[in-house]
Design a protein with these regions (language model features):
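N-terminal extracellular/periplasmic Venus flytrap/periplasmic-binding protein-like
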Residues: 14-16, 27-36, 44, 178-272, ...
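Short, well-ordered amphipathic alpha-helical segments that serve as non-catalytic structural scaffolds
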Residues: 31-45, 69-73, 98-101, 162-168, ...
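Active-site nucleophile and cofactor-binding loops and adjacent substrate-binding regions
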Residues: 66, 85-94, 260, 325-327, ...
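Flexible glycine-/small-residue-enriched beta->alpha junction loops
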Residues: 113-167
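Glycine- and Gly-Pro-enriched alpha-helical subdomains that act as flexible
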Residues: 272-320
Length: 360
């Protein structure tokens, strides 16, 4: 096959709405949400599911989800049992890593068609008790939150990830006002984009339960029309325990950081040769990718290193790009990385930033 035929391309993409913590999507597990994405991707793309070489899905808080979450989503989504599935846990980068693995397999000639994405239900993360396997002989037992221990707690720094975000703010020179202004701009852009229907095509409708009632959810629950600078300025710091490390004003609040959410998203990645042979419309091509790592407390600066490494591979510079999408959980991180990469914010965030769509 000609090398151009091995180029990975995206032929279809979709996502569920982003549900608030304990909100409209909380009755569905992560594999349930993933299955809806799998089913809709196959239907939208118009491909026979037996042509899939693999399903790769990211999932972080796997406690209580059940064995092989990606396999659950795949089979429930209508993919034949003969198609293998792989679950990826790279914390926040899990879903994107799934897409990278799909592209790599296709470029290597190991596959022609892969469904890749991510799924999470933070609302359904359980509590558990350590030590009960051997039996508790004396004293109290404490419940631990799997959402915190498996997803939001740094195993190296032994602190909330938000504490590392506070460190990022200081190292990156980002103030509380900077973060609030950035968050407000993001909210306004998101509300505008939603009102103009810019996300309508990518969002699939989800049937869920609200108590005994069945509801259909087709909108993101995060963005708030009533957000104002006055409201954001009144919010208390989200990680007061960080005050022991940082004596000046704390920066992270519920208004300038991502919330806890439920949702799933995915793409179908094909080789260009397969797409052409089957008459499939191409949405985008995947030209390159880079993964990067830093010291744990510096993790929020990793995108700067990754993007610089990517541009070195591509022999480009940041000014060559007309649009940059930087998906980060904290406004302070987004700002620190924007400054670190010298990105023109006017061409970077046309609709929203991620803290908005996932906001509380």
């Amino acid at each position: 096959m000609h090398s151009k035929d091995r180029e990975p391309v995206i032929i279809q993409s979709c996502r569920t709405p982003i549900g608030k913590f304990l909100g409209a999507l909380s009755s569905l597990s992560a594999p349930d949400l993933g299955a809806l994405v799998v089913e809709n991707l196959i239907e939208r793309a118009g491909v026979e599911p037996q042509y899939l070489d693999e399903v790769i899905m990211g999932n972080v808080v796997g406690t209580g989800v059940g064995q092989a979450p990606a396999r659950q989503a795949s089979v429930r989504g209508g993919v034949p049992e003969s198609v293998p599935a792989l679950t990826i846990n790279k914390v926040c980068g899990s879903g994107l890593k799934a897409v990278m693995l799909a592209a790599q397999a296709i470029r290597a000639g190991d596959a022609n068609l892969i469904l890749a994405g991510g799924m999470e239900s933070m609302s359904n993360a359980p509590f558990y008790i350590r030590g009960m396997r051997n039996g508790l002989k004396f004293g109290n037992a404490n419940l631990e939150d799997a959402l915190l221990s498996d997803g939001l707690w740094c195993a190296f720094g032994h602190c909330h990830m938000g504490t590392h975000a506070e460190y990022t703010a200081r190292k990156g020179g980002v103030t509380r006002r900077d973060a609030d202004e950035f968050s407000l701009r993001s909210h306004n852009l998101a509300i505008k984009a939603l009102s103009e229907g810019r996300f309508a095509e990518e969002i699939i409708s989800v049937s869920s339960k609200n108590g005994r009632e069945k509801v259909v959810v087709d909108f993101d629950e995060g963005p708030r029309k009533d957000t104002s600078m006055n409201t954001l300025e009144k919010l208390k710091p989200a990680f007061p325990e960080a005050s022991g490390k940082y004596q000046d004003e704390l920066t992270i609040t519920a208004g300038n950081a991502a919330g806890l959410n439920d949702g799933a998203a995915g793409v179908i990645v094909a080789s260009r040769g397969f797409a052409r042979a089957h008459g499939l419309e191409i949405e985008a091509k995947i030209t390159n990718y880079v993964a990067s790592g830093l010291e744990p407390r510096d993790l929020f600066f990793a995108p700067v290193k990754a993007v610089n490494d990517l541009m070195t591979k591509e022999k480009t510079q940041i000014s060559d790009y007309d649009l940059v999408e930087l998906n980060e959980a904290f406004a302070v991180q987004a700002l620190a990385d924007i400054r670190g990469l010298k990105i023109d914010i006017a061409v970077s965030y046309t609709h929203l930033t991620l803290p908005t769509i996932y906001s509380v």
